[in-house]
């Protein structure tokens, strides 16, 4: 009888200890309401705190403790998360693309949709960067961010409670209970989780680097949550802007395509699948669905800032384009481009067969029938209701909303500017540099020379590397020089 009483007492004690630990460390708390839609997109939770969230104070000091692992090492101009290209408003607690939400009593910082879908621009070298909400991630280096976290976790000398808590103490004095949780649970737990990430992302080392402004969007999903064996495919492609996606809504019963290759034909499913890819599970979906619906509504309506290229400004301005060039360029656009790139065009947001468009095929081959079927049936214990995953044979004719902010061009960012997009592929640059956010007033897009921008981190693009081919999309390449200048003038205003 005494044994059973002791055993029962032990079970009750264990139950209360477990419940206390859950309430303290794991019970999801509601994120404070974010009223402004832009701020919500930039900082709202997508339900991935339990899988991707880093305890706030660890997240806060990692770039300081491991500054030598930042993309530019100790010479980086900023020993914080802006080293990876994210925009950080002065006075904001978090950079764009990060969400803060508590599990139990501990705030966690997690990436959200905006970590890839944000942009910035400068109209001159000395002007301040301007945030572009939901924009093409032209400054972001997701692979460098991933590798930084892995290298930090692998550093046995510094990723430990003594070093990290010493760094935290430079910013705040944690209560004794919280310091103990960080020392004995959160720091070793975060290290262990990141080391698992290191193992999960080993496949990256055998493939070409993504580079600034690009990502391999679905191989991490294939080899991770879908548990498909790593293959030789390369998915490197530019991070698309999420603007005016109401234009991708079904029209006259016909579904329109989303993603570069049209692997989905439903915007809401795209939002949910994206959150899953970033770590949301069915366990957190119920508390996150309202947020995802808000994101769905937001990206269907948001527009980019208007182009600075205009005809009604001082002719001495580098952004001046003549009314005559605009008129001639618009006619050429209607004749050569509008059937694919305008909402009323017959091929708008339709998949153009790879044999016709002729651009690099690697991104297309990365998405397989096996991946499609596994994503449709992801997590057998929960019915996500996915109905619109596809496997296509080409790339989507997307709208040109905010074209001036999308450079470099083509799905893999292999053409530096609009002027060279109108050249025959054989004449396009084989080497250029991306990462600048200074608008190229001469050529459209962003500056792409090795030394054009001293303030930005620049990445060398070599179009001979697998996945980087600048072939294809020959529309407009047979125009006369004068016609190309007129079309270029018009495209700059898009």
Predicted regions and their residues:
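Short, Lys/Arg-rich N-terminal segment immediately upstream of the first membrane anchor
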Residues: 1-5
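Periplasmic c-type cytochrome electron-transfer domains
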Residues: 6-10, 16-494
């Amino acid at each position: 009888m005494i044994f059973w009483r002791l055993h029962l007492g032990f079970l009750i004690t264990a139950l209360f200890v477990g419940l206390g630990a859950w309430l303290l460390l794991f019970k999801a708390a509601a994120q404070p309401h974010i009223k402004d839609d832009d701020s919500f997109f930039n900082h709202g939770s997508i339900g991935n705190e339990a899988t991707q969230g880093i305890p706030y104070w660890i997240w806060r000091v990692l770039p300081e403790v491991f500054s030598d692992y930042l993309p530019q090492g100790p010479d980086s101009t900023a020993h914080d998360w802006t080293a990876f290209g994210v925009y950080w408003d002065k006075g904001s607690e978090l950079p764009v693309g990060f969400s803060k939400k508590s599990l139990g009593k501990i705030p966690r910082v997690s990436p959200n949709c905006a970590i890839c879908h944000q942009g910035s621009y400068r109209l001159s070298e000395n002007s301040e960067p301007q945030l572009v909400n939901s924009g093409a991630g032209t400054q972001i280096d997701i692979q460098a961010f991933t590798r930084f976290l892995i290298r930090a976790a692998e550093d046995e000398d510094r990723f430990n409670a003594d070093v990290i808590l010493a760094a935290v103490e430079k910013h705040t004095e944690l209560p004794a209970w919280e310091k103990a949780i960080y020392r004995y649970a959160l720091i070793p737990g975060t290290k262990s989780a990141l080391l698992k990430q290191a193992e999960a992302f080993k496949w990256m080392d055998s493939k070409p680097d993504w580079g600034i402004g690009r990502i391999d969007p679905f191989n991490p999903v294939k080899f991770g949550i879908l548990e498909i064996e790593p293959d030789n495919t390369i998915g490197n492609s530019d991070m698309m802007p999420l603007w005016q996606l109401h234009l991708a809504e079904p029209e006259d019963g016909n579904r329109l395509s989303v993603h570069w290759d049209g692997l989905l034909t439903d915007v809401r499913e795209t939002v949910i699948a994206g959150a899953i890819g970033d770590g949301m599970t069915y366990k957190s979906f119920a508390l996150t669905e309202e947020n995802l619906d808000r994101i769905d509504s937001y990206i269907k309506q948001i527009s980019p800032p208007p182009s600075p290229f205009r005809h009604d400004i001082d002719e001495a301005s580098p952004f001046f384009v003549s009314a005559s060039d605009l008129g001639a360029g618009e006619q050429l656009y209607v004749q050569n481009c509008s059937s694919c790139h305008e909402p009323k065009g017959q091929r708008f947001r339709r998949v153009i067969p790879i044999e016709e468009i002729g651009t690099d095929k690697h991104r297309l081959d990365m998405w397989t029938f096996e991946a499609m079927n596994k994503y449709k049936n992801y997590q057998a214990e929960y019915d996500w209701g996915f109905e619109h995953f596809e496997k296509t044979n080409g790339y989507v004719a997307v709208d040109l909303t905010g074209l001036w902010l999308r450079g470099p061009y083509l799905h893999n960012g292999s053409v530096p500017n609009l002027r060279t997009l109108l050249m025959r592929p054989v004449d396009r640059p084989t080497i250029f540099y991306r990462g600048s956010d200074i608008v190229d007033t001469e050529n459209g897009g962003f500056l792409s020379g090795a030394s054009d921008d001293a303030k930005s981190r620049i990445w060398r693009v070599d179009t001979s590397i697998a996945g980087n081919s600048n072939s294809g999309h020959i529309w407009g390449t047979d125009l006369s020089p004068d016609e190309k200048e007129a079309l270029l003038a018009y495209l700059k205003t898009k």
